Amino acid sequence: MNIDLQRFCANENDPREYLRAPWRDGGWVYATNGHLVVRIRDDGAESIPARSSRHPNAAAMFRKHIEDRSCEFMVMPPITEPDKCTHCGGAGFVSAIKCEDCVDGEFTHGDYEYTCKNCCGSAAGPGWADAYEKYPSAQRVPCAHCDFMGYSLNRNGATNIGGALYSTVYLWALSLLPQCRICPGDAAYSCLGTGARETPAALIFDGGQALLMPRIE
């Protein structure tokens, strides 16, 4: 099964550009957006760059939370598809143009700075104005209301598994991986000496592994 890791990467609005695409390291290919990290076996694709000094040491995270941890995996509970983002319709992207009235959602008049009303609340976020796809200068921009996922993270809330809360949107995305199984964070309480809120959920699936940080309400 071909697994698209790009959906687990940071989006184009994230200042950490080195997280916007997968990278390879030690026989694995990694992807992360800072909330979750997924890795699959490296099939030798030349288009994927090697880990740089800016990339996190994801291998150490998997070693700590899967290889050195007494995990008891269970089949991922059924996760109902979350409500799609009302701004992008579930696409994760919207059509927008650079706002001509401001810089990143603000403009200066005299000695004061003001919030731009032209792009305030736009689907693409501050500094972008909504536009039709066929508008001459329209660009395909990550939706600012769902962090490129196509589903609102806040509106869909969290799901309790094993005593810890996890983003329903991220759980659902991970549940689509083949034969996905999960070990909730609280299963590692005794061996790591930390609570469920501090320990990521460990997941395994056919061809790879993942870690998901709990959500604090």
Residue ranges of model-derived segments:
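Intrinsically disordered, low-complexity linker/loop segments enriched in Gly/Pro
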Residues: 1-39
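C-terminal functional regions that serve as terminal interaction/effector modules
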Residues: 26-27, 31-217
